[in-house]
Amino acid sequence: LCRQWNVRLKVYRENVPAYAKEHGMTEEEAGRDIRRTCFCKVLKEWGGTKIALAHHENDNVETLLWNLCRGTGIRGLGGIAPVNDVWIRPLLCVKRREIESYLKKRGISYCTDTTNADRRYMRNRIRMDVIPYLEDCVNTESVSHMGKTMERMYELEQYILEEVGQYKESCTGWKN
């Protein structure tokens, strides 16, 4: 696909299970760690400034539900930050099924992390059991509603941080 669309591609092959064992983490965490390390290498090598990740609205809802179950504050209610340093997430307002439908209509294949189907991970149980239950039995638009709530909570957090920063500056003359 990259060759067909003339998009540069760099492929890394890593032993995720070995890395996980060596670093005392789950394969899910190890895969994420390795991907991020590789992304940063390519960013530097190619002189980029941002790395776009494919997190979508369903991922964000999984994060919200997981945060709620563990207890969270306003930051956790905002879900995944759309921009965090070099990391950008332009698909947070798009549902997984919309992305899959788009790809299917165009005959574009995609791959997913193999750990995504492993029910040992709580995030996967939220994805495979809780969210479908909410959509089937509570509200078919549960994901959209939670997505909009997270947007508002994220904006509220940003507003509070800005206001606190300005107040701190006015009281102390200290700038961030």
Question: PLM features: residue spans?
Answer:
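Core alpha/beta nucleotide-donor-binding catalytic domains of modification enzymes
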Residues: L1-I131
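ATP/NTP-dependent adenylation/nucleotidyl-transfer catalytic domains that generate, transfer
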Residues: Y121-N176
